[in-house]
Every structure is written in C-alpha cells, then in structure tokens.
Amino acid sequence: MDHLPMPKFGPLAGLRVVFSGIEIAGPFAGQMFAEWGAEVIWIENVAWADTIRVQPNYPQLSRRNLHALSLNIFKDEGREAFLKLMETTDIFIEASKGPAFARRGITDEVLWQHNPKLVIAHLSGFGQYGTEEYTNLPAYNTIAQAFSGYLIQNGDVDQPMPAFPYTADYFSGLTATTAALAALHKARETGKGESIDIAMYEVMLRMGQYFMMDYFNGGEMCPRMSKGKDPYYAGCGLYKCADGYIVMELVGITQIEECFKDIGLAHLLGTPEIPEGTQLIHRIECPYGPLVEEKLDAWLAAHTIAEVKERFAELNIACAKVLTVPELESNPQYVARESITQWQTMDGRTCKRPNIMPKFKNNPGQIWRGMPSHGMDTAAILKNIGYSENDIQELVSKGLAKVED
C-alpha cells in the first residue's frame, strides 16, 4: 500500500486509520492516532461539513494531522469507493446512533469481505444492541453521563451537575483508541479482524465505579460533594487559602500526624477515633471529621497559597494551586515541558493549543499540518486507491464526492 504524503514519525507510523463521525467522541480517537503518527482519514458528509467546523478555534486542535475525505459512503459508487478504501485500512472507527451502519447495509461482514483483518470500532451512546427504547437514540456527553450514573455523583449536595468539558466524549474516544489497538494486536497475530461495540454510557459507568461499588455491594450511595470537598474523606478536595484556591489530598500516616500538629489537633492522634496508623480521615464515619475540616479551613484561610504549598511540600502532602487558564502559559512546569505549543493553520494563521501527549522518548508524536478544509484531500485519497481523474470527476458530478475548490 502506498501512503498519502506525510512525514514518517511516531509509534504508529505506517498505520492507516479511517473514521466517520462528527463533533468530539469518535474524532478524538482518530486525533490520538494521528498525533502518534498514523495516517488518519476523516470522512465527512458531502453536503454538510462536520458541525465541529462552526467552532472558531477548537477544530484546529481536534482535526490537526488529518486527511479530509468528503464522500457519500452509503450510496452507489460512493459506497464502492469506501469499500475499496477499507481494503487498505487497518482500523475503521464510526460514531453514530446504534447500528446505523448495519441498517444502511455496511455490516461488519461486508467490511470483512473486503478486508478480513480489519479492526472495526463502533462508538454510540447506547451500544449496537439492547432494547429498541434506547439503542437507536442520539447521545452526546451529558446523555451518557446522565444514563450511566456518573452525572448524579457530581455537582454539589444541592444539585447534580455534569462534568465538563465533555468528559464522556473524551473518555469514550480514548476507549475507542485503546480498544482498537488491542484488537489490532490480535488481528495481526491471527489474521482475523475484530468488531468493537463501545457504548458511551458503559464507558462512563466504568469511570464512575469508585463510589458505585458501595451501592452494588452494600446498598450505600456516597453523597455528592460539598463546596468541592471529597464526599468521603476529610482533608481531600477543594479548599480556600488567603489568596485563592488549592486542592489537596491528606493521605498517609505521617502526613496526617504532621498536619494535625500544624492545625492544633495533635491531641486526637492515637485516640480510638483516630488510632495510630490512620491513613485517611473519614468525613462521615469519624466523629472528628467535621472538626478536622473546621480546623483545616481556618489554618488554610490564614495562609497564602505559596505558604501552604511550601509547608505541604515539606510534609509530603499532595496539593496544587487551582490555576486559571491565563496562568498556564507562564507556569514553569508548562514551559519546561512545552505543554502548550503553536503551529500554522492551513490558511497561514498561528494557532496555540495543548501539545501532543503523552511524550514518547524514542518515537515522539508530531504536529505536521493544521485542520484540512472540507474535501481538501478527497482527490489524493481516491487516487491513492486507484481512481483516475475521470473517475473522481464522475463521483463529484453525481454529488457523491466533494473536492477542494
């Protein structure tokens, strides 16, 4: 297989990934592959571009490093071109409502007829099967959070609240990435492809497991947070200092002992309620939980963030200032690791955004192009799989493909 023009880099160089999906969840999976060196083809509708394009800045991050193909993959010759593309594809990711592809004739079996080794990842809100009431419903971030039990655990004691920005989309996209790579490993070993059914609500069910386990195995449901503090453990969560907010985790035997000395509670150490060797202070079950919070609040309010960070570093207590977005760029850790970078968009503008993560030492990722325009690479991709100029123009004239003007 001849690859499309692009630099060779990263741990996934030589891999061809194709995705069909809009907005965040499915495309985020494609984005991760592209940043790690895979050749990633982004399929868009011919008549309507991906709705993410209406956003002024985010698409330049979420669609960088991609090749843009505008093709009607469900109709006539457009479908034929798509299936021919699948013959040279390693991983195909589609994000839609339930078994939408199967309903329109593109089943796993049809795809495997063209490429027996193909890894197929289906990403939807409620899965490829189940009840009619749910399977075919549309879903976005908040829907998956609400249906999974994740949303009800977040927010404040007075009201549940979704976790933003778009947590379910990113978790689901990353799940698609890791699952597809696991399936690819097996497919290369056996010569047999795989189909992966990723339901966004099940991803969030898994991510929300920590507190749910107490309900499933004892009928006890954890309360929601109060003003950003951990619902279970004292000394954990969001706290206010004299000049702003920090988060902290009071975890560990020596950490608790030394912190209690600072806040005036050393006399409680070694009591039946806080025996020697205590590693966590339970906010509810420990009768001194409210007192610990009261004393800690008072101590923190009397000190600046810098003073707290310095003291907690001495005590090995994990804490961090709650940074504002403008503070990120000048933070020395961000600067040292180049966590924020910039590149040129396709129209020559400078775009500043988060850098590639994680950082591979021997085969690092790379940003080699900005977001392509609608249909920008259609002709190049179709030529790559054997189509002539006349073939491409015929697809365009029938409204089955769009090429860049």
Swiss-Prot record:
Alphabetically ordered keywords of this record: Cytoplasm, Transferase
Cited Gene3D superfamilies: Crotonobetainyl-coa:carnitine coa-transferase, domain 1, formyl-coa transferase, domain 3
Pathway field of the UniProt record reads:
Amine and polyamine metabolism; carnitine metabolism
**Is the keyword Cytoplasm assigned to this protein?**
yes
Q: Which family does it belong to?
A: Belongs to the CoA-transferase III family. CaiB subfamily.
Q: How does it assemble?
A: Homodimer.
NCBIfam families, from UniProt? PRK03525.1
Q: What is this protein called?
A: L-carnitine CoA-transferase
From which organism does this entry originate? Shigella dysenteriae serotype 1 (strain Sd197)
Name the gene for this chain: caiB
